[in-house]
């Protein structure tokens, strides 16, 4: 089992300019800082007999046997990227609820990528994690 803890962030200026469709057209800069609130991602390889290959717990609980059936796009694409083809459970626990503008989706992406690197026994730099999570 791997547990990551990723901080939330507050953007002081430039919020939204970090969105690819915006900065590709207009450019952009963001000034932000992390805060003392976190999103935790727990990744556990399932052992034994399970009914569903993928269990993803976020605001919803998903049970799927095919990656393409996972509704959470971050989880789906991370599992696809890391070629996870064995039973796995992904759970998130957050200090602050989603949709607050504090970067919960980004924190989830970073935490999940970090956890999946660890699960695959690959040491990754912070830069590598950030690039893949983007």
For each predicted feature, which ranges?
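Alpha/beta catalytic cores of group-transfer enzymes, especially the acyltransferase/condensing modules
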Residues: 126-134
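Short, conserved phosphate/pyrophosphate- and ester-handling motifs at nucleotide-, phospho-/glycolipid
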Residues: 105
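ATP-binding N-lobe of GHMP and related small-molecule kinases
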Residues: 1-102, 114-124
């Amino acid at each position: 089992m791997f547990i990551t803890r990723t901080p939330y962030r507050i953007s002081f200026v430039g919020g939204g300019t970090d969105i690819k469709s915006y900065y590709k057209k207009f450019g952009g800069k963001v000034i932000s800082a992390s805060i003392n609130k976190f999103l935790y991602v727990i990744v556990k390889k399932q052992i034994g007999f399970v009914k569903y290959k993928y269990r993803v717990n976020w605001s919803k609980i998903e049970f799927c046997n095919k990656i393409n059936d996972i509704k959470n796009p971050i989880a789906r694409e991370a599992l696809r990227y890391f070629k996870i083809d064995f039973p796995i459970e992904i759970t998130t626990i957050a200090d602050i609820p989603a949709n607050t503008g504090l970067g919960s989706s980004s924190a989830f992406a970073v935490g999940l990528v970090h956890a999946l690197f660890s699960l695959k026994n690959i040491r990754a730099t912070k830069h590598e994690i950030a690039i893949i999570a983007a």
